[in-house]
C-alpha cells in the first residue's frame, strides 16, 4: 500500500530528452514550450502549472498551463540568462472550478432557487478556504464574492475573475508534480555565431612567421565582413621531434613550421611549453592577451582550438609518462589510424590509473584560457575521448562560466555526434559538407531541425575546413563557393568558414583527395588580403543580411519549399513579421529556371492581394501575387535572399531601417 497517492496523473512531459536524463538546449531570449498529459478520474476540473527557476536562484516562477485538447496542457517560459533552468509540471484538482462547472449547469438547467442557494453556500465554503491563503487585496475580493454568494447572487458565481482568484489561492487538493527537467541556456552566440578560422602565423605579406600582434591587424577586416567569432587553430609551441613537413610529409626541413596540432615544444628560454603556452614566434602570452583585447574592442569573440594530444616534446611526456600508452618495450605509443601513422603526436590514455589527476589537469587547460578572456572553444576529435570525461568537465566548467561555448569537431557516426551534444557541447560540426543535392539537404535539414534532435543538437555548418576541400567546391569554383556560403549562413543560424582559402576560391586539392594542396596545417602561406576579386564583399553582404533579419538567426521555423527544378533548393524562415525565403542553385555551370511555390496561407501572406518580394542579396524589388513565382538563377547569381511582406511596406520602411543600421 502506498504511503501517499494522488488521483491526478502527469505524463508525457515534453520536451524531455531520454525521459529527462539530459537537458534540452536554448539560447538567451528563446522560449521553451512545454506540454504535458494531465489526467484525473471522473469529471473533476484540473489546475495545471509550469514551475520554473534558474538553478542559481531559489525563487520559482509559476505560469498557468491552459488545456489544449485531449487532456493535453501547454505552457511556455522565456530563458533570459545563461546557465541551467529547472522546470516541472504540477497539477491538482481544482475544486472551485469543478463546483463552478456543475453550478452553471444547474442554473442553465433551471433548478429551483432552494437548490441554487444550497449550492451557493457550498461555493462560499470553497472561497473561504481560498481567502485564508490570499493576500489582503485578493482576500477583500474573495470576501465580497462570499457575501454575494450568501445573498443568493448566482451571477457572481459564474465569472472568470472569481474562478482565477480561487485557483490561485485555494489549497491544492490532491496535488502531484512531474519529475524536474533541465534546460541548458547558452549565450546568444551559440545560436547565431558566424565563425571565421585563420592561421595567425600566415597573415604577413611574405612567408615569414607572423606574430599575434600582426594577426590582430587583420581583425578589423574580419569584423567588417560581419563575422563575430575568430577561431584560431592551436597557438601552442609545436614539437620538433618527428615534425611533419609540407602536405603531411613524414619528415620536415629545418625551416618547416610543423603542424599546430602537434602540441608541445620549446619556448624562447629553452624550456618546454604545452597547452598553457603560446608559441614563441607568435609572441607569447602577452601578445595573445593583446590580441584578445583588440578582438573584444571590435566586438569579436576569440575561439581557441583544444586538442588533447601531445608531441614527444610536450612537458607532460617527461612529467607524467603514466598519462600515455606504452609499447611492450616501454616506449610511448604514437597516434595511429591504420594504415595512417602520426608519429608527431602521442594520444592520451584516459584510462590510466592516475586518471583523476589527468582529468583535473585537462580541465585546467580550459580554465587557464578562460582566465585570459576566452570563453569559446573548438574541441578536436572529442569522440575519441571518454564520454564520462566530457560530461564531468563541461558541467564543472559551466558552474563558474555559464557563458561557455564549445564546438564539437566530431565527424563520426550520428548517434555519437548526438550523444556529445547531450553531454554538453553547444555546437557541432555536421555532414553539411557532404550534402550536395536539394533532396539530400532537405532530408538532412528535416532531421536536424524538425526532430527531437533540435532540442539539444545545434548544428554548425562549415563549407570547408583545413582538413576538407570537397569536390563540389573544386568542380564548381566561384559559383559553388557562393552557393555553399549562402546555404551555410542561412540554412543554419550558426556557421563557420575556413576563411582565406575560401574567400580566395582556392580549389587546389592534394593528390585528388578532399584536402587542400599546400595545406596551411603544415606550412606558412601568404594571402592577398586586399584582392578585389575575392569573395569578401559577397560574404560581408550575406553576414549583414543575417544580422539585420531575425528570421535568419534561428532554425526552428525553417520550411522547405518546392522549386519545380531538381537543382534548386528553397526554404523559408520566419521570426515575428520578418519572413525570409532563400533560393539557391546547386548547379554551378548552368542557368536554372524554376517556379517557387509558396504556401501562402501557412506563411501568412495575402491570398488575393499583391505582396512585396525584396531580393536583399541583389537589392531587387518585385511585386508578387499568388503561389507560383518564376525563378532564374545562374552561375553569376546562384542565390536569392527574399524578404516578403505586404506590398507598399518594404521599400520605404526598410530604406529607413537600412539607413539607421548603417549610419
UniProtKB/Swiss-Prot annotation:
The record marks 467 as: Transition state stabilizer. CDD domains: AmyAc_GlgE_like (cd11344). InterPro entries: GlgE (IPR026585), GLGE_C (IPR049171), GlgE_dom_N/S (IPR021828), Glyco_hydro_13_cat_dom (IPR006047), Glyco_hydro_b (IPR013780), Glycoside_hydrolase_SF (IPR017853), Ig-like_fold (IPR013783). GO terms for biological process: alpha-glucan biosynthetic process. Signal peptide: none annotated. The active site is at 380 (nucleophile), 409 (proton donor). It comes from the Bacteria. Residues 238-266 are annotated as: Disordered. The keyword Repeat does not apply. Disulfide bonds: none annotated. It catalyses: alpha-maltose 1-phosphate + [(1->4)-alpha-D-glucosyl](n) = [(1->4)-alpha-D-glucosyl](n+2) + phosphate. Its EC number is 2.4.99.16. Alpha-maltose 1-phosphate binds at residues 244, 309, 344, 381, 521-522. The keyword Glycosyltransferase applies. Maltosyltransferase that uses maltose 1-phosphate (M1P) as the sugar donor to elongate linear or branched alpha-(1->4)-glucans. Is involved in a branched alpha-glucan biosynthetic pathway from trehalose, together with TreS, Mak and GlgB. Belongs to the glycosyl hydrolase 13 family. GlgE subfamily. Homodimer. This is Alpha-1,4-glucan:maltose-1-phosphate maltosyltransferase. It comes from Salinibacter ruber (strain DSM 13855 / M31). The lineage of its organism: Bacteria, Pseudomonadati, Rhodothermota, Rhodothermia, Rhodothermales.
Amino acid at each position: 500500500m502506498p504511503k501517499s497517492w494522488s488521483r491526478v496523473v502527469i505524463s508525457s512531459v515534453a520536451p524531455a530528452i531520454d525521459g529527462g536524463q539530459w537537458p534540452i538546449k536554448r539560447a538567451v531570449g528563446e522560449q521553451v514550450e512545454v506540454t504535458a498529459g494531465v489526467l484525473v478520474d471522473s469529471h473533476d476540473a484540473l489546475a495545471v502549472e509550469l514551475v520554473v527557476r534558474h538553478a542559481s536562484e531559489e525563487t520559482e516562477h509559476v505560469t498557468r498551463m491552459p488545456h489544449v485538447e485531449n487532456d493535453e496542457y501547454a505552457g511556455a517560459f522565456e530563458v533570459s540568462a545563461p546557465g541551467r533552468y529547472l522546470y516541472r509540471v504540477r497539477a491538482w484538482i481544482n475544486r472551485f472550478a469543478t463546483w463552478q462547472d456543475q453550478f452553471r449547469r444547474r442554473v442553465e438547467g433551471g433548478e429551483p432557487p432552494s437548490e441554487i442557494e444550497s449550492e451557493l453556500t457550498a461555493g462560499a465554503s470553497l472561497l473561504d478556504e481560498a481567502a485564508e491563503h490570499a493576500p489582503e487585496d485578493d482576500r477583500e475580493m474573495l470576501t465580497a464574492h462570499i457575501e454575494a454568494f450568501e445573498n443568493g447572487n448566482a451571477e457572481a458565481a459564474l465569472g472568470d475573475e472569481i474562478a482565477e482568484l480561487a485557483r490561485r489561492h485555494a489549497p491544492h487538493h490532491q496535488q502531484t508534480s512531474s519529475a524536474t527537467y533541465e534546460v541548458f541556456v547558452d549565450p546568444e552566440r551559440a545560436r547565431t555565431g558566424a565563425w571565421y578560422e585563420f592561421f595567425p602565423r600566415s597573415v604577413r605579406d611574405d612567408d615569414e612567421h607572423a606574430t599575434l600582434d600582426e594577426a590582430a591587424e587583420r581583425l578589423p577586416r574580419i569584423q567588417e565582413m560581419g563575422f563575430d567569432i575568430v577561431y584560431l587553430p592551436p597557438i601552442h609551441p609545436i614539437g620538433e621531434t618527428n615534425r611533419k613537413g609540407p602536405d603531411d610529409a613524414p619528415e620536415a626541413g629545418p625551416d618547416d613550421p610543423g603542424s599546430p596540432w602537434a602540441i608541445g615544444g620549446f619556448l624562447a628560454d629553452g624550456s618546454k611549453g604545452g597547452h598553457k603556452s603560446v608559441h614563441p614566434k607568435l609572441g607569447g602570452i602577452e601578445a595573445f592577451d593583446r590580441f584578445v583585447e583588440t578582438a573584444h574592442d571590435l566586438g569579436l569573440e576569440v575561439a581557441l582550438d583544444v586538442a588533447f594530444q601531445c608531441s614527444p616534446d610536450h612537458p607532460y611526456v617527461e612529467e607524467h609518462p603514466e598519462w600515455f600508452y606504452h609499447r611492450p618495450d616501454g616506449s610511448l605509443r604514437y597516434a595511429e589510424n591504420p594504415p595512417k601513422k602520426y608519429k608527431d603526436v602521442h594520444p592520451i590514455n584516459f584510462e590510466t590509473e592516475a586518471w583523476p589527476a589527468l582529468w583535473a589537469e585537462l580541465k585546467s587547460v580550459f580554465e587557464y584560457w578562460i582566465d585570459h578572456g576566452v570563453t569559446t572553444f573548438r574541441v578536436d576529435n572529442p569522440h575519441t575521448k571518454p564520454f564520462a570525461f566530457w560530461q564531468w568537465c563541461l558541467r564543472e566548467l559551466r558552474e563558474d562560466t555559464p557563458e561557455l561555448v564549445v564546438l564539437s569537431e566530431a565527424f563520426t557516426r550520428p548517434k555519437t555526434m548526438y550523444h556529445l551534444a547531450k553531454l554538453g557541447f553547444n555546437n557541432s560540426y555536421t555532414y553539411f559538407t557532404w550534402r550536395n543535392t536539394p533532396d539530400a539537404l532537405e532530408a538532412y535539414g528535416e532531421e536536424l531541425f524538425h526532430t527531437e534532435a533540435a532540442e539539444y543538437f545545434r548544428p554548425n555548418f562549415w563549407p570547408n575546413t583545413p582538413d576538407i576541400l570537397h569536390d563540389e567546391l573544386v568542380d564548381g569554383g566561384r559559383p559553388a563557393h557562393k552557393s555553399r556560403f549562402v546555404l551555410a549562413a542561412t540554412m543554419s543560424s550558426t556557421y563557420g568558414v575556413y576563411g582565406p582559402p575560401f574567400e580566395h576560391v582556392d580549389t587546389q586539392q592534394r593528390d585528388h583527395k578532399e584536402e587542400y594542396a599546400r595545406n596551411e596545417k603544415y606550412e606558412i602561406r601568404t594571402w592577398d588580403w586586399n584582392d578585389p576579386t575575392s569573395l569578401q564583399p559577397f560574404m560581408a553582404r550575406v553576414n549583414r543580411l543575417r544580422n539585420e533579419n531575425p528570421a535568419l538567426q534561428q532554425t526552428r521555423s525553417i520550411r522547405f519549399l518546392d522549386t519545380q527544378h531538381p537543382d534548386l533548393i528553397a526554404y523559408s524562415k520566419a521570426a515575428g513579421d520578418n519572413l525570409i525565403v532563400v533560393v539557391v542553385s546547386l548547379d554551378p555551370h548552368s542557368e536554372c529556371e524554376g517556379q517557387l511555390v509558396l504556401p501562402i496561407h501557412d506563411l501568412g501572406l495575402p491570398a488575393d492581394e499583391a505582396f512585396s518580394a525584396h531580393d536583399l542579396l541583389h537589392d531587387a524589388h518585385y511585386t508578387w501575387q499568388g503561389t507560383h513565382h518564376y525563378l532564374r538563377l545562374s552561375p553569376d547569381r546562384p542565390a536569392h535572399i527574399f524578404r516578403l511582406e505586404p506590398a507598399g511596406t518594404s521599400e520605404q520602411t526598410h530604406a529607413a531601417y537600412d539607413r539607421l543600421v548603417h549610419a
